[in-house]
């Protein structure tokens, strides 16, 4: 997910309980969506997901992350600045019952701040940080277990666009997808182990993969220029 964000794709997080394939109770995994106005409609909910105003929980309604950049910008928001500048980030972890763990702020795939502690009903755990952006990038928040190994909450990103430039945060991540698609094309060739899964028009399938590879190659080239 972070690799795709680093390539400039704006992807909303959403999730749900895969019952009966998953043994956890229904509602254990859910998506919070910010919906404008007092009336909730299906269209507003879908639009909220499409626009990235989401937080995914693996612990039902027992906890929530409230991410704000520059006090008002939440997940899905695009912040535009004309030149290198700082943004102020805050996240609040609220709970319905006492939980210990840690909250983290992630920018361009790297943890830039973390806070360990205990959140209690009416007494959320709060983390503040400042991040400088010289190039376009993104920020999100997540709640981990005390060891920092398991995700329980994750927000969609806030995007910071500098001088109207695209997000090209990592040349390596873009190259990763070029290599990945090259491997797929190799595996689906006649005689390849995955060829049997494409009994129809293989050339059409390959054309789609090549088109995607060309997009990533363009991102690689742009990333090298932006990050030089």
Identify the residue ranges that each predicted region occupies.
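C-terminal functional module detector
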Residues: 2, 6-13, 17-228
